[in-house]
Amino acid sequence: LAPNLEIGLRINPEISFLDDSRYDPCRAYSKLGAPISSVKETLVNGSPILSGLLFHNNCNSPDFQELLLTVKKLESELGCVLDNSRWINLGGGYLFDGDSVNLDSFDEAVWTLKSKHGLEVYIEPGSTFVRDAGFLVSTVLDLIENGGKAIAILDTSVNHLPESFEYDWRPDMLTDIKQGRYSYII
């Protein structure tokens, strides 16, 4: 390996907080991280090339108690791995906004990882910071009718804003008039 190269492993902490499995990175048969139960023995016995761990086990959660519970599980299952790592990435999935609760649990989780295990702690920005960070600008190319519904054909597709399809999320439209005379499917 190159001298400055660091290798991390994405783990699945196998602790779920979501009711909707579509958004649950820790659901059964998830491809989003190696399950702790599958890699625990290998990791506990040592991995000289592993620099850190990454997990992501939530989606749009305002409750940081869930993060603390995850960190406590990691400590109980992989405490010695944490002690021998340089960093940990707490992933995303938590909302840092006016609806957040148990922020003291966030502080405790980070403090535990830094002070007890000596880890550099990263957290991904999440939708709180990036959801409204930009705009998708589109032009109506054509209007058609199908089955009595007006449809606007745009110069963009769902591929440019996949969460509108994946998560059944309706983005705000700059010129949208809620009670306007016209209604279109886009």
Give the positions of each predicted feature.
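Solvent-exposed alpha-helices and their adjacent loops that cap or buttress functional pockets
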Residues: 2, 24, 46-47, 89, ...
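Active-site-proximal loop/turn and secondary-structure-junction residues that shape catalytic pockets
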Residues: 11-15, 57-59, 94-96, 127-129, ...
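A broad, structure-centric signal for solvent-exposed, well-ordered loop/edge residues
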Residues: 39-41, 62, 97, 130, ...
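Conserved beta-strand positions
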Residues: 55, 90-92, 123-125
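Short glycine/threonine-rich loop-to-helix capping motif typified by GTGT followed
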Residues: 63-69, 97-108, 132-142
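Charged (often Lys/Glu-rich) extended helix/loop segments that serve as interaction or gating elements
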Residues: 109, 120-186
